[in-house]
Amino acid sequence: MARATPLNRYRNIGISAHIDAGKTTTTERILFYTGVSHKIGETHEGSATMDWMEQEQERGITITSAATTCFWSGMGQQFPQHRINIIDTPGHVDFTIEVERSMRVLDGACMVYCAVGGVQPQSETVWRQANKYKVPRLAFVNKMDRVGADFYRVKEQVKTRLGGNPVAMVIPIGKEDDFEGVIDLITMKAIYWDVESLGMKFEEREIPEELQEKAEEYRSELVEVAAEANEDLMNKYLEGEELTEDEIHAAIRQRTINNEIIPMYCGTAFKNKGVQKMLDAVIQYMPAPQDVPAIKGILDDKAETEGTREASDDAPFAALAFKIMNDKFVGNLTFVRVYSGVIKQGESVYNPVKMKRERIGRIVQMHADSQQELDEIRAGDIAALVGMKDVGTGDTLCDEKEIITLERMEFPEPVISLAVEPKTKADQEKMSIALGRLAKEDPSFRVHTDEESGQTIISGMGELHLEILVDRMKREFKVEANIGAPQVAYRETIRGTVEQEGKFVRQTGGRGKFGHVWLKLEPLDLDSGVDYQFEEQVVGGVVPKEYHGAVDKGIQERMKNGILAGYPIVGVKATLYDGSYHDVDSDELSFKMAGSIAFKKGFMNANPVLLEPVMKVEVETPEEYMGDIMGDLNRRRGMVQGMDDLPGGTKQIRAEVPLAEMFGYATNVRSMSQGRATYSMEFQKYAETPKSVAEEIMKKFSGKDDDEE
């Protein structure tokens, strides 16, 4: 079967934006104009096609990056038909993982900005991720019909806040209620969209007189940018010759794909103006799969050589699984981006990460919530595979004879944990199935059982992230659960060395109990990774060998439950060196108790301390909020380790802060910086808890022990 659309007419793009920039409405209009969607869905009525999970419809924010395929031949049918695969990305900072995941498989991105709000914090986060994966981008300034809309201010912010190089391709005709259309700076014509046909039709007119001068000023800026593409154009420009429209298009395309410039468009998706022109730009300036560098990977040889896969049907098959979803009708869906080669339904692929072969069942192309069956997928395609058994997010699927492992995605460590408990016994099993499925879909969500409390602990990227996962558990899996408060895992250890006696004697009628030991306790280096060591140096059999294991067991059981404040004890070496026994009354239990008693007393005499987890925190913030953020980190017992300058006037602060002080930080950092600062944190080390804090924790725990001598 031949390829339906030539590869050079493919565009794999993402639409990315801050929460309220109107990205979903923009995507809806794209689907409408490209003929996929016949009735326009509105986010604020909760019916947008791309937002197909129930909570997204309720909250009006996009959570899952759904992949959709559509076709476009230009506003005036001036191009051959192009295939556009759109990946919708979420705009909330807790879903950064989704954005990162989609950036990884895109060839280009369209950044949507609100004409009133401009460049906002999530825009900065998304921008950094697009930089990381070197994704070419264009910008669309939406909501030009709103009070306070200002295209030129947003253009300036892209330059100053993001360090981008924006180039206006159109300028607006009017603004707010008077926004009527745009001026195309290449053709120098005014474009007005027809209201009756919901913007399907348009007409070109002469530029309004009052905008002629402004249009000429911005056109000369555009031509100069185009002339910088190569020497021939530069010479032509410097000699005062006019560049042709074709030359300008080719130059802007080249510079956009090289990540040198950001073409900017504007409009109002809600009023059906401007999105059509931006779609033309996707075809004109966004890269086809073969315009971006070939994907790199590691070949399956001894030396682990780096290899590449060219975007071509003739190259060996290689694809990346970038999202796993559960569909209520077909079950497990694995979204893949095919980089090279062809695969047909029923054929097998190899997963080098799991070292397994899997057979491809059905292949479906997704349109938001409906799907079309395919017989095969080829280089450049984005589609979903049904029924893959053991494929995780970020895994490679490739030809078994030509094995390559594509660069894996990096997933951040979760920063917040909560305990969840099923409300009834019946919910218990459903809950573990639900959590398992959700963790498979979302690599930034982890589940484990706390050994100390037996509770199920879920961890994720933020409070909203966990809230939505708990919500999905309720809706999709019908599991009712109680949620606990966020917790910190403290530890206990000793700083000094002691020798301590432990005696356990019971004398009741008949056989008694007798165990007697001397232990030496000393601290171990916490960085060594060894939490406990037991040695025996008993001379002359004063404690018979068969009881040594019991002493060790008594110590370990005592360590598990802590002594100072009920937290596990780490970093202790115990040496059994002396003691005594009784022929009749001694047994294993007696020596287990004696070991436990000696350890408890010795621990309290060996300068015991409480340890707390310390996190490595990185905050990226515009300079004007730096003072507030530094002051706040100091109040949280943070130690600032260093600072760096980032492009666009952003500062990066690196600090070490105790986890106990970081709860609620996401909300604080947003309010201190009007939402413009972002942060990440990961576990760094365990460190001694200051005395005042430790006393507070110990006060809550009053250890009641019934050991007797």
Curated annotation (Swiss-Prot):
Instruction: Please list the coiled coil stretches.
Output: none
Q: Which UniProt keywords apply?
A: Cytoplasm, Elongation factor, GTP-binding, Nucleotide-binding, Protein biosynthesis
The cellular location(s) given in this protein's UniProt record come to: Cytoplasm
Q: What SMART domains does the record point to?
A: EFG_C, EFG_IV
Write down the PROSITE patterns for this protein, in alphabetical order. G_TR_1 (PS00301), G_TR_2 (PS51722)
Q: Does the keyword GTP-binding apply?
A: yes
Q: Mind telling me which InterPro entries this protein's record contains?
A: EFG_II, EFG_III, EFG_III/V, EFG_IV, EFG_V, EFG_V-like, EFTu-like_2, G_TR_CS
Q: Which residues form the tr-type G domain?
A: 8-290
One MF term in the entry's GO annotations: GTP binding
Instruction: Tell me the residue numbers annotated for binding GTP.
Output: 17-24, 88-92, 142-145
* Family to which this protein belongs: Belongs to the TRAFAC class translation factor GTPase superfamily. Classic translation factor GTPase family. EF-G/EF-2 subfamily.
- Could you tell me what this protein does? Catalyzes the GTP-dependent ribosomal translocation step during translation elongation. During this step, the ribosome changes from the pre-translocational (PRE) to the post-translocational (POST) state as the newly formed A-site-bound peptidyl-tRNA and P-site-bound deacylated tRNA move to the P and E sites, respectively. Catalyzes the coordinated movement of the two tRNA molecules, the mRNA and conformational changes in the ribosome.
NCBIfam families cross-referenced by the UniProt entry: EF-G, PRK12740.1-5, small_GTP
| Listed name of the protein | Elongation factor G
- Specify the species: Psychrobacter sp. (strain PRwf-1)
Gene responsible for this protein: fusA
